[in-house]
């Protein structure tokens, strides 16, 4: 269970070297949970795209190419004119089955988190962040 009794959040840290949760590797964390593989496997997979784009491995461009090559569909869901904007917690409550990689924002930065059967896995509770889109929906 997550902090403050939030049953939709669960702490998740697959990076064995990041003992203080300071690495800024949310995209790699989300992908490890989504695909059920080790942190270094995802990192190595992203480096292949990084060598082409010359962006850091966890850049959103590399993530998109990685997921496109694995045929994981993306759905844009952010509408700046909408009265109610869906948060990660709202999305979790509405999607209690399947796996998703949720794209949200933290300040001016990008944040990715994996939702697995209604629970989002991360090093911190990002439930109040606005969902811009998501990949997946696999069972």
Whereabouts are the PLM-identified features?
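Active-site nucleophile-adjacent alpha helix/oxyanion-hole segment immediately C-terminal to the catalytic cysteine
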Residues: 1-74
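Conserved active-site-adjacent core of cysteine acyl-enzyme catalytic domains
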Residues: 49-107, 116-125, 131-132
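Short acidic-hydrophobic catalytic motif
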Residues: 113
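Charged phosphate-binding loop/patch that engages nucleotide di/tri-phosphates or the phosphate backbone
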Residues: 133-139
């Amino acid at each position: 269970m997550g902090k403050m009794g939030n049953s939709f959040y669960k702490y998740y840290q697959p990076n064995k070297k990041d003992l203080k949760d300071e690495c800024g590797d949310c995209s790699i964390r989300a992908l490890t949970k989504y695909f059920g593989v080790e942190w270094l496997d995802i990192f190595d997979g992203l480096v292949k795209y990084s060598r082409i784009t010359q962006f850091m491995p966890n850049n959103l461009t590399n993530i998109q190419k990685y997921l496109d090559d694995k045929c994981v569909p993306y759905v844009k869901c952010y509408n700046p004119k909408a009265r109610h904007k869906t948060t990660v917690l709202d999305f979790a409550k509405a999607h209690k089955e399947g796996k998703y990689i949720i794209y949200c924002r933290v300040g001016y930065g990008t944040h990715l988190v994996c939702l697995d059967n209604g629970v989002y896995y991360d090093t911190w509770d990002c439930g109040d962040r606005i969902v811009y889109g998501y990949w997946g929906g696999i069972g």
